[in-house]
């Protein structure tokens, strides 16, 4: 979220991976607050997607997590079958593009959120396993925008069952994690919540 810009992404694709209208809206904050919004649209398709007829929740081309760095947008996909994430890159400019595949990371879970503090060169991903166990995945000490070239650390969170969905930070040390409501009566009745996480000692 660069200063002065807000990004809203329509990139979820978790049924059959067959959406053809994937896009991100970039809005100038000042224009929005002034009542005359200036909105740029960045639409895309995946450069390596050939199959648009996957069974429900088996696609490798779902995505909920992305970060913005200078002139590029980096997306971390939610690969339902493999429990991995692939990194794709888009220009941070209006237009239609092919999202370029960069690399794959075995997160052993479904990635749902990302936050990046550029000054600290640290990305924190959040997600959950197929058994509902939430986790964080830290990427740090990397070179340039080769996010997987540095250190990596997976942190299991102390929650019994939680569908983690979003993460944010101001200082790269203290984080806010949100979870989705999950109701499966009579077994589950988990409300939407926000959790504070202190990663100072990590």
Predicted regions located by residue number:
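Sequence/structural signature of beta-propeller domains
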Residues: 1-202
């Amino acid at each position: 979220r660069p200063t002065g810009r807000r990004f809203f992404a329509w990139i979820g694709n978790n049924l059959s991976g067959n959406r053809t209208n994937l896009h991100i809206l970039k809005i100038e904050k000042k224009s929005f607050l002034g009542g005359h919004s200036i909105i740029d649209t960045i639409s895309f398709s995946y450069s390596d997607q050939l199959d648009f007829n996957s069974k429900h929740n088996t696609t490798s081309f779902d995505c909920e997590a992305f970060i913005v760095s200078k002139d590029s947008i980096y997306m971390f996909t939610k690969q339902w079958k493999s429990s991995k994430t692939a990194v794709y890159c888009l220009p941070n400019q209006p237009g239609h593009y092919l999202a370029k595949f960069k690399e794959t990371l075995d997160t052993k879970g479904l990635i749902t959120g990302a936050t990046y503090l550029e000054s600290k060169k640290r990305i924190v991903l959040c997600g959950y396993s197929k058994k509902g166990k939430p986790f964080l995945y830290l990427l740090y000490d990397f070179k340039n925008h080769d996010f997987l070239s540095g250190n990596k650390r997976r942190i299991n969170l102390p929650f019994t069952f939680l569908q983690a969905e979003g993460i944010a930070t101001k200082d790269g040390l203290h984080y806010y994690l949100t979870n989705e409501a999950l109701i499966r009566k009579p077994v589950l009745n988990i409300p939407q919540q926000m959790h504070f996480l202190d990663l100072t000692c990590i």
